[in-house]
Amino acid sequence: KYFNFHSKRKCIITQSTLNKKPNSDNFKNAQSKAALAALLFSSITPHAIALDDAAPIASPPQVMEVEAPNPNTSNPLPFSQNLVLNAPKTQASPVSDLPESTQWRYSEFLNAVKKGKVERVRFSKDGSALQLTAVDGRRANVIVPNDPDLIDILAMNGVDISVSEGEGGNGLFSVIGNLLFPFIAFAGLFFLFRRSQGGPGGPGGLGGPMDFGRSKSKFQEVPETGVTFADVAGADQAKLELQEVVDFLKNPDKYTALGAKIPKGCLLVGPPGTGKTLLARAVAGEAGVPFFSCAASEFVELFVGVGASRVRHLFENAKSKAPCIVFIDEIDAVGRQRGAGLGGGNDEREQTINQLLTEMDGFSGNSGVIVLAATNRPDVLDSALLRPGKFDRQVTVDRPDVAGRVRILQVHSRGKALAKDVDFDKIARRTPGFTGADLQNLMNEAAILAARRDLKEISKDEISDALERIIAGPEKKNAVVSDEKKKLVAYHEAGHALVGALMPEYDPVAKISIIPRGQAGGLTFFAPSEERLESGLYSRSYLENQMAVALGGRVAEEVIFGEDNVTTGASNDFMQVSRVARQMVERLGFSKKIGQVAIGGGGGNPFLGQQMSTQKDYSMATADVVDSEVRELVEKAYERAKQIITTHIDILHKLAQLLIEK
């Protein structure tokens, strides 16, 4: 009664039915069973019979109903009359080898295409992915690599190909999206520019293109620099000139009653560190009028024409506040001589200086604005700046003398605890040629040394050590010096000192040291004459003595250690001697053969519109004479130094031994 049907149409009669023993009931239905068996086996194909493996049961056994034969019905077929078989219709389900997921690998996609199981594909807009539709209706997505043969494979297998138009689908939105970013960027830049100019965007300082033309000068309606003329020492003549300018601003009637006119400009000239800017700050603190200050380097910037624009803007503001003072520091940055002609291009500084000249004394005039300027390079300034009507006064701020250095030391010692042994006069005499900035640095270094040594006061020792540190560099206390090297350096420095001390009309010896400082293994300090230093006048005998003193170190090495054991320690001495001897022959007229003739003059700076190169204004024969004269001066100085050392060799030994011991 029970039958299992496999998908391959194999039929198996259940063992429980066949194993039943025959009885009367079974025998009665023998004909029906025989007919049923004949029908079933007739439907089995030879292929199905050949498959003798047991098939898994796919579903529960189906109940088959067999009706009893009807005697009233005739059927020509044996065993089949009145037999009705009501069985469910079965069909084998096809097995699919397509992937079950919705995301296929590219290899799976190609296999399906080649087997004809892909009906159509739809590529994305950028071609990086596609969506397929299989023949059974399912859909899947595939990531497409860069395969140039893919389109040909799809076409050969009859696959319908299409391309997506994108997600937007509307060209208007695409155009708007492309224009939106540039518009936002332009609006942002416009907002920043407006903000930098104090427009509706609000005040700000981010800087805009129109802000380049504005002057960056610092303005003080009531200057509070904290500096007055009482704080300026060592520049009495310069201070007097500027005090007159301040008095002109405070009491103009005193001068105009006599027909005097206010100076248009005042140029402060002097070496670096002499107090030019300090004097300008003192003028601002004393004048009591509006004060504009700027650096000349601030005029020239990125864009062409900015320098002239800033000069105009500066003087517009100054004229609105007249009477006032405009201070331009380091004016040589824009006031260099015009017309050099090198490079073939436009120099922005020329436009700036032209505008400055016009504003100071142009067609429109300039009333009530005094221009102060400072420079340490007056030789590079344009001649138009230096003429009357521009900078009417040139105030030279030179290095202070002894009395000026004493007053400067007193100013910079305010607020510092000094010991009783500090003598400003002695310090001033040991610092010839020092500027105000140098003396300020000296006192500051002395205070640092005192603090490093845990002292409560600054003594003369700290000031002396600070002076040597500034001149020669810091001590190399940890330097390992052998006894042989120490002895050599001691005799070398003793030779300098001995020749200098016994040479007539030369500077006195101030200090000898064999402690390494900076690049020097030892130093001999001489105290130059204040009168000679200030006047700048040096006699022939002084220059010859200077060369002999410089050669004293090499002579001492040669006498004590022999010619084969001399060292390179005298290399700088030789350079100094050669320079002095050549100047004596070529420029100073101290040669009998050359006479009072200056030869070998420099050609000037081509960047200042001067000569492009050095011109040789003497013959080769004259050059040979110059060389022989220089060599003769050096040899004469060497013999003088050697004579002094050999004559006083005992003093040399004692001095060297004293240096080694201390």
UniProtKB/Swiss-Prot annotation:
Q: Where does Zn(2+) bind?
A: 492, 496, 573
Q: Which EC numbers does the record give?
A: 3.4.24.-
Write down the top EC class of this protein.
Answer: hydrolase
GO MF annotations, alphabetized: ATP binding; ATP hydrolysis activity; ATP-dependent peptidase activity; metal ion binding; metalloendopeptidase activity
Q: Which PROSITE patterns match?
A: AAA (PS00674)
Q: What is this protein called?
A: ATP-dependent zinc metalloprotease FTSH, chloroplastic
Cofactor note (record)? Binds 1 zinc ion per subunit.
Q: What is its subcellular localisation?
A: Plastid, Chloroplast membrane
This chain's function reads: Seems to act as an ATP-dependent zinc metallopeptidase.
Q: List the disulfide bonds.
A: none
Q: Name one Pfam family in it.
A: Peptidase_M41
Keywords per UniProt: ATP-binding, Cell cycle, Cell division, Chloroplast, Hydrolase, Membrane, Metal-binding, Metalloprotease, Nucleotide-binding, Plastid, Protease, Transit peptide, Transmembrane, Transmembrane helix, Zinc
The transmembrane segments are: 35-55, 173-193
**Which InterPro entries does UniProt cross-reference here?**
AAA+_ATPase, AAA_lid_3, ATPase_AAA_core, ATPase_AAA_CS, FtsH, P-loop_NTPase, Peptidase_M41, Peptidase_M41-like
Residues given in the record as ATP binding sites: 270-277
Task: Give the organism the record lists.
Answer: Capsicum annuum
Could you confirm whether the keyword Transmembrane appears in this record?
Answer: yes
Q: Which family does it belong to?
A: In the N-terminal section; belongs to the AAA ATPase family.
The alphabetized list of GO BP terms reads: cell division; proteolysis
Would you tell me the Gene Ontology cellular component terms? chloroplast membrane
Q: Which gene encodes it?
A: FTSH
